[in-house]
Amino acid sequence: MKTLTVKEIKEHLQSVSDEKDPFIEQCKNDERKSVQALVDAWLKKNERLSAMREEWQAMTSFERSLRARGYQYIAGIDEAGRGPLAGPVVAAAVILKEDCEILGLTDSKKLSKQKREDYYSYIMEEAAAVGVGIADAHEIDELNIYEASKAAMLKAVQALDVAPDYLLIDAMSLAVDTEQSSIIKGDAKSASIAAGACIAKVTRDRLMDEYAEKYPLYGFEKHKGYGTKEHLNALAKYGPSPIHRRSFAPVKAHE
C-alpha cells in the first residue's frame, strides 16, 4: 500500500463503492494518518449513501407495489401555493422512470432552495413525463383555493406527454377515470409525489420572482406571496396588486 501516494489513494477511493472491496481493508491497515483520515471520510460518506438508498427504497414503495400489479405510468401529483395571499397555485404531475434513483429527494419544504433547483433540473431531464398546471389569483377567487388547487392538478395531468394509468395524489382526489390513491403527506412518502412537489414549488417560486419585477412594491421575491409582516405592511400601504387573492381576508381588508 505504501507504494501508493496519498493522492493516488484518494483518487482510487473515488472509484470504490463497496465497503467489502479489498482496497478498503488495505487502507484500514495503512499506518499513515492521512490515509486513515481518507478511509474514515470514505466510510462516513458510504454510510450516508447507504442510508439515502434505504430512504429511496421506502419512498418508492408505493410505485413498486403498483408496478407489481401491472401499472406502468404512475404519476405523482402535488401543488405549491395554497397558503399565500398573492400569486397562483401551481401543480405538477411527474411520471418517474422505473430505474431512476434520486437520492435525498423528500418533502420540498425540507430542502434548501439550491437542492430544489438541482432536483428540478434532474427531474425535468430524466423523468418519463412532467406536466404543470396553474390556477391564477382570479381563478382562485372564483372557485376557492381548494377547488382551484384541484383544477391546477387536473391541468397538470392533462399536460403530461404520457397518459398515466395510475395517480398518486398528495391529500386529494381528482374527478377523472384514472385509478388513483390519495396519500396524506404524500411528498414525504412517495418519490413521484415528492418530484411533483419539487417541480411545483420551483415553478411557482420562479413565477413569483417574475411578478416581483412587475410589481416591485410588495417584495414578492422574498416571501413568494405569503403573509409576512413586510407583505402585510405593503398591502396596507399600497393596496392589492392584480395578482392578489381578493377572496382572502387579509387582502379583502385592504381593498
Curated annotation (Swiss-Prot):
Pfam families on file: RNase_HII (PF01351)
Coiled coil: none
Cell compartment(s), UniProt: Cytoplasm
GO CC annotation terms, alphabetical: cytoplasm; ribonuclease H2 complex
Alphabetized InterPro entries for the sequence: RNase_HII, RNase_HII/HIII, RNase_HII/HIII_dom, RNaseH-like_sf, RNaseH_sf
Annotated a divalent metal cation binding sites: D78, E79, D170
Disulfide bonds: none
Biological processes, Gene Ontology terms: DNA replication, removal of RNA primer; mismatch repair
Cofactor: Mn(2+); Mg(2+)
Residue intervals of the RNase H type-2 domain: 72-255
Record-listed E.C. numbers: 3.1.26.4
UniProt keyword terms in alphabetical order: Cytoplasm, Endonuclease, Hydrolase, Manganese, Metal-binding, Nuclease
UniProt catalytic activity: Endonucleolytic cleavage to 5'-phosphomonoester
Molecular function per GO: manganese ion binding; RNA binding; RNA-DNA hybrid ribonuclease activity
Record's function text: Endonuclease that specifically degrades the RNA of RNA-DNA hybrids.
NCBIfam families: PRK00015.1-1, PRK00015.1-3
Family stated for the protein in its record: Belongs to the RNase HII family.
Protein name: Ribonuclease HII
Species of origin: Bacillus licheniformis (strain ATCC 14580 / DSM 13 / JCM 2505 / CCUG 7422 / NBRC 12200 / NCIMB 9375 / NCTC 10341 / NRRL NRS-1264 / Gibson 46)
Gene: rnhB
